[in-house]
Curated annotation (Swiss-Prot):
Function: Component of the ubiquinol-cytochrome c reductase complex (complex III or cytochrome b-c1 complex) that is part of the mitochondrial respiratory chain. The b-c1 complex mediates electron transfer from ubiquinol to cytochrome c. Contributes to the generation of a proton gradient across the mitochondrial membrane that is then used for ATP synthesis.
Subcellular location(s) per record: Mitochondrion inner membrane
Cofactor (UniProt): heme b
Listed name of the protein: Cytochrome b
Originating species: Eunectes notaeus
Binding-site positions, a ubiquinone: H193
């Protein structure tokens, strides 16, 4: 039977014996993606993409639809779990040199951009106060593009301000983009298994591989069980932990919130945007904070793939991870000293990681020759 052959191929997939828990996040992302598509479909059935009814339809789903509260909370918290997993997945790729599999890395970065766009469109759909103002601020950045900016913004809004056509467009985009993500994920997995996974040592795994099943299957299932447990605990006991209090009020274009901020998983990029006082400069920095990941495979100069035996790069990497968290924290604070200065310093260190990567590699090569 064809499905038995597929299962056999999957079970016999050769995998390095020494890949650690950090390699489990790929399968967890597939699980998150499946959860988001399923819960998203059931929510879309009851959602109304109209500025007068959108907020009420979310309340209707939560109160009146059987298990609607569960679908809504699973979808919202599931998005946060998705981003936690994807950030760890990217960090593992940076630490262990997985980016040297160039096609896989480039397709993965494209996936990240698509995922961030999908999450942004989804954040606008409840039409709460923070949804509306976050959409206004972020989409308004398009006007910074010379010549085409104003036309592009008007086209995206469907008019001269955020209104009903904007919500309809965002709902359509939020619905269609996950199918693009599924297609790109399939390509990502195919490109990965063409060359095979790396391992913590960064060495060639061909001499020491075992079938994927049963060892790695159970390893994946353990992490999936842990993630599912955490997800259900948050959904059951603290479903609003990631929500902004302002978003429990219906969107009002006449009242500006004290602090406009997107969801927590965009705060690092928003913090970088805020740290530059110039509009065009901020928009470029925001874009570069994600697009710069595309440069990593082409700037690797070290003779060693993994950072496991590179103490200088390890220090740089953990400084980068700490900087990511600091930028996220500063983005939640008011635009006033000392937060502006901390944000600017942290943003500089964020980009310095990508500049220092090839320099550190070159220095390590020199030291090894001594």
């Amino acid at each position: 039977m064809p499905h038995q052959q597929i299962l056999m191929l999957f079970g016999l997939l050769p995998v390095a014996t020494n890949i650690s828990t950090w390699w489990n996040f790929g399968s967890m992302l597939i699980a998150c993606s499946t959860l988001q598509v399923l819960t998203g479909f059931f929510l879309a059935v009851h959602y109304t993409a109209n500025i007068n009814l959108a907020f009420s339809s979310i309340i209707h789903i939560t109160r009146d639809v059987p298990y609607g509260w569960l679908m809504q909370n699973l979808h919202a918290i599931g998005a946060s779990m998705f981003f936690i997993c994807i950030y760890i997945h990217i960090a593992r790729g940076l630490y262990y040199g997985s980016y040297l599999n160039k096609e896989t890395w480039l397709s993965g970065t494209t996936l990240l951009i698509m995922l961030m766009a999908t999450a942004f469109f989804g954040y606008v759909l409840p039409w709460g106060q923070m949804s509306f103002w976050a959409a206004t601020v972020i989409t308004n950045l398009l006007t910074a593009i010379p010549y085409l900016g104003t036309t592009m913004t008007t086209w995206l809004w469907g008019g001269f301000a955020i209104n009903d056509p904007t919500l309809t467009r965002f709902f359509a985009l939020h619905f269609i983009l996950p199918f693009g993500i599924i297609s790109m994920s399939s390509l990502h997995v195919m490109l990965l298994h063409e060359e095979g996974s790396s391992n913590p040592l960064g060495t060639n795994s061909d001499i020491d591989k075992i079938p994927f099943h049963p060892y790695h299957t159970y390893k994946d299932l353990l992490m999936l069980a842990a993630m599912t447990t955490l997800l259900l605990l948050i959904v059951s006991f603290s479903p609003d932990i990631f929500n902004d209090p302002d978003n429990f009020s219906k969107a009002n274009p006449l009242v500006t919130p004290q602090r406009i901020k997107p969801e927590w998983y965009f705060l690092f990029a928003y913090g970088i945007l805020r740290s530059i006082p110039n509009k065009l400069g901020g928009a470029l920095a925001l874009t570069m904070s994600i697009v710069i990941l595309l440069t990593v495979p082409f700037t690797h100069t070290s003779k060693m793939r993994s950072m496991m035996f590179r103490p200088f790069m390890q220090m740089t990497f953990w400084l980068f991870a700490a900087t990511f968290m600091v930028i996220t924290w500063t983005a939640t604070k008011p635009v006033e000293p000392p937060f502006t200065l901390i944000g600017q310093a942290a943003s500089m260190i964020y980009f310095l990681f990508f500049i220092s990567n090839p320099i550190m590699g070159w220095l390590e090569n020199k030291i090894m020759k001594m």
